[in-house]
């Protein structure tokens, strides 16, 4: 489940670090989180879509690694990002 251009642009604008930022870790995590939520909704109705389930697990792993990187570099940024995106309880 991909994101359309308008959704990507909105995510970039809300999570960018500076004016021309499109690929910072914060933006990547936000995009992955949105894709994960869309794919999770898809899998609720299509329980036998194993290829999509595999893709979902890969995306979750990538997001976990990116969040770990942010946490190692700056704990305050990590906490703000987790709160802003609404993940991890």
From Swiss-Prot:
GO terms for cellular component: cytosolic small ribosomal subunit. Transmembrane segments: none annotated. It holds the Pfam family Ribosomal_S15. Keywords: Ribonucleoprotein, Ribosomal protein, RNA-binding, rRNA-binding. It comes from the Bacteria. The keyword Ribosomal protein applies. One of its GO terms (molecular function) is structural constituent of ribosome. GO terms for biological process: translation. Part of the 30S ribosomal subunit. Forms a bridge to the 50S subunit in the 70S ribosome, contacting the 23S rRNA. One of the primary rRNA binding proteins, it binds directly to 16S rRNA where it helps nucleate assembly of the platform of the 30S subunit by binding and bridging several RNA helices of the 16S rRNA. Forms an intersubunit bridge (bridge B4) with the 23S rRNA of the 50S subunit in the ribosome. HAMAP family: Ribosomal_uS15_B (MF_01343_B). Belongs to the universal ribosomal protein uS15 family. This is Small ribosomal subunit protein uS15.
């Amino acid at each position: 489940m991909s994101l359309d251009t308008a959704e990507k642009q909105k995510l970039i604008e809300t999570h960018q670090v500076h004016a021309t930022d499109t690929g910072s870790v914060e933006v990547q995590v936000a995009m992955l989180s949105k894709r994960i939520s869309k794919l999770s909704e898809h899998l609720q109705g299509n329980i036998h879509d194993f290829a999509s389930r595999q893709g979902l697990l890969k995306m979750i792993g990538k997001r976990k690694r990116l969040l770990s990187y942010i946490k190692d570099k700056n704990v305050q940024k990590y906490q703000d990002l987790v709160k802003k995106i609404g993940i991890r309880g």
